[in-house]
Amino acid sequence: NKNFLARFRGWIQAAATLLTNIHIPNLFKGKIYQGNVKTMCVPGLNCYSCPAATGACPIGAFQAVVGSSKFKFTYYITGFFILLGVLLGRFICGFLCPFGWFQDLLHKIPGKKLSTAKLKPLRYLKYVILVVFVILLPAFVTNSLGMGDPFFCKYICPQGVLEGAIPLALANSGIRAALGHLFTFKFTILALFIILSILFYRPFCKWICPLGAIYSLFNKVSFLKIQVDHEKCVGCQKCSRVCKMDVNVVDTPNHPECIRCGECMKACPTDAICYHYGFSTKKQAENKN
């Protein structure tokens, strides 16, 4: 079935989260896995300090290199971003990111849901955060040894608290005793995004995530795309109405905000929307106008 990925998305997200955090026993031991695999980056936003983490967070790894006193252009991590971006684009956000799945689960909690359609300008904030907190501040705000802090991880990222600080503190009395104002500040950010995720769909992905900002740059050229068959399309706009990322699916199926979740495919009454594999866009006709 052409919509196989969309139909089994929840299971794929669960499997991806498990593979990204395969060392489950470490959660109870309060120890961080530091084996050879930890030098490799995982696709989604997943804290290095999570005791169960299989690999490194690409954003954290990038900041570590940028903030190093012996800074060199990080060919490995930059190449990692480009490779995954060119192959999948923001499919990673929709299917492979643990924090994205966490927000999806929160949004399933029954209650009033709010639209982000009128908040579209906030989507550009994640690009500002990418440039300022992931690149510029770690590179140029340094200590006496010439080393910069991982500003995004340290001061913004809620995933670090959820996966790293909280499990480690629960398992280690020494860490609990050392928690201070920074933890309180970060925990407040996490709590805020938990509340926002119940009300809005994926607020962190839309407005804050620098990893999503990077992958979004490749959405229009990636190997995996969304394809609209305009000969089948009847212009009902059901696809755009169900899109929780506020994308006009018919006009811009591969918009930078599209996370390839497939909800538009399930809503289409004529099966005019499907995944398209390949770099060629010949089959992906533009709209009739």
Segment roles from a protein language model:
Residues 1-250, 256-289:
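Non-ligating segments of multi-cofactor redox enzymes
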